[in-house]
Amino acid sequence: MKYVLSLHQNSRRGVILFATGLIILWGSAAMAMALRSPAFKQNGHIPSKFTCEGEDVSPPLAWEGVPNGAKSLVLIIDDPDAPDPKAPKMVWVHWVVYNIPPATKSFPENAGKAGLPRGTVLGLNDFKKTEYGGPCPPIGRHRYFHKLYALDDTLDLRSGTKSQIERAMQGHVLANTELIGTYQKGDR
């Protein structure tokens, strides 16, 4: 009887440990960061309003699942297909935004300087500006990666470039997510 009781207790303990593990795993999956836009879907067409052929304003973006312990967020939008998607030679940076307060959940359309939360810093893009520069592909359909990072620190940089920010982020990324949109000149 003692053997059966011991086996029963061990089984119960195993079930409890298994259930606890499932709760931890399920909780982690539920907390994954996600980035979305009401203007376009993942791998979808970016409306011309947000490009050089339209108003050239930043699209609305919303995110969730920023991990506890995050001290800042970084948003980078770039195009890995420049200048020609059949023979890409460079990654073109369209927008760099960092030191976004972690409680921030979204950017409105045309966030610009006035629509960004206090403390947020705009970095230098490849247009040599500290503002959003929309898609304007010279050849073919390009992909535009909207990458959001949660960091365990803030970045001590003034109008940093993408490469400076990526170096400063090393070892500080808690989580990241991305949203990809596409655009080709003439699309509406």
Say what each PLM segment does:
Residues 1, 6-7, 92, 140:
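Intrinsically disordered, low-complexity regions enriched for glutamine and histidine
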Residues 2, 28-29:
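Domain-scale selection of a single, long terminal region
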Residues 3-18:
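Bacterial N-terminal signal peptides that target proteins for export
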Residues 16-27:
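Bacterial N-terminal signal peptides
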Residues 30-188:
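N-terminus-centered regions that define maturation/targeting leaders and the start
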